[in-house]
Amino acid sequence: MAKQIKTIDYDSENDIFSINNGEKVKASIDIGDFVLDVNHNNFICGLEIMSASENLGISKDVLRNIRSMKMSVNYKTNHVYVLLMILFKKEGKEVNVPIPLTLDLGHKTPRKEMLIYN
């Protein structure tokens, strides 16, 4: 079952995009311009992207106008694959943004999880 994304925030002045599902954060992991928040079960519960417009290839104006969003997370034994599916208010179109990350969160078996905001 999909988890609900509780908050989406875009700070256009600092160009920082963040989402979280409201779970308590055990640790934050910095990977370049990306910060992953991990819960006590070692699952991603939040994501922060610095220089978001550049890293996502999306204008600041568009990032201010997100209507809905899904974040698919595939946990493998030695990496995590995050896919953001963003629907924008103005254009009414959806953009898929893949974020492959090499990160071992200690998962012994592959698992997929979906977080949704609408």
Predicted regions and their residues:
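Intrinsically disordered terminal and processing segments
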Residues: 1-31, 40, 51-118
